[in-house]
Amino acid sequence: LAYIGGSITQGAGAAPINTECYAYKSYQLFQKRFSAKNNVKFIKAGVGGTPSELGMIRFDRDVLRDGQQPDIVVIEFAVNDEGDETKGDCYESLVRKVLNLPWKPAVILLFSVFANDWNLQDRLSPVGKLYDLPMVSVLDAVSPQFALKNDEGRVITKNQFFYDMFHPGNAGHSVMADCIEYLFEKIDQAGHASLNAFELGLTEEKILQEKLNLAPVIGNSFENIRLLDKKDIYAKAYIDEGGFDSTDTQLQSVEMDDQLSLTPEFPYNWMYDGTKNTLNRVKAYFELEMECRALLLVFKDSGEVNVGKAKVYVDGEYHFTADPHINNWQHCNAVIIFNNKTSENHVVRIEIAEEDRDKQFTILGFGYVL
């Protein structure tokens, strides 16, 4: 069982974070229901404050690490994707990326909820409907009963469910796990072939494949996205790292799987450090040349005063400025540099703003679609 998502999947609000989070609890419930030998493996890859725009880039590294082939993947980004530039294209791309894996894992879409009874399930649920995926809505499960009194059928109050505005506490994580267990129960009771399998003579896998051949409901621009960093180099990419010759070790780190220890995200990065090396200030740029259809930059946000801005140019034209202080806390930020219809050769230059040459900036990696 694998789980990918934001801070709720990471376990925020649960104590201890590794065993009281919904992911671990639902994995235990799955094992209790289906496993006779306690031989179910648990993969957890939640990263706080990050949307599916980052999730689709880090999926291979974080979920499929060490040759893992999960049979079930739970995707939880319904409260993280408000800032998604593509309004759902990244989410559907991630879903399709998982569904298209050679061993055909099952996918569950999980819609968490904030304390103001908000999530993005109205935007994202059409993706589940198109591919006939099971969807678990925590909003539908808990929000309607919050307004009731005890004698009217209220099961849990908002204060009991939530640790803060954005994250469930231990009780909330337990309820989320119960919601997923309810899905397991329903699936366990259901027949293993859908009605269509008898009518059309097709297996469920073939029906899914036909749906994957249909036009996406939002978009699939990034379903073949790959990660490019110092570890996963693309042979046909030409890189001039310029002054980005250091490696940043002060990174957003998360509790993976059932561990309490922290694992850094994107450790194979390129860091410009103008605080130590004055020679670097002469070469305050990084250049990447490659043929691709789409390219995303992943850079490090930070609240530190010694971190500066970088300007992003494509083929000599200014596109945008990457500013770590907009979010102002240490975390991974994925932004689209370009997303085109056809693949062409481009030169991307990332240049430290002139007034920030004595500061630091970290390129965590790139996501690219050929």
Predicted regions, residues:
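Loop/turn elements at helix/coil->beta-strand transitions in domains of secreted/extracellular proteins
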Residues: 37-41, 68-73, 102-107, 131-134
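Cell-envelope and extracellular/periplasmic
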Residues: 7-8, 12-14, 43-60, 68-83, ...
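Alpha-helical scaffolding within the catalytic cores
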Residues: 23-30, 52-66, 88-97, 119-123
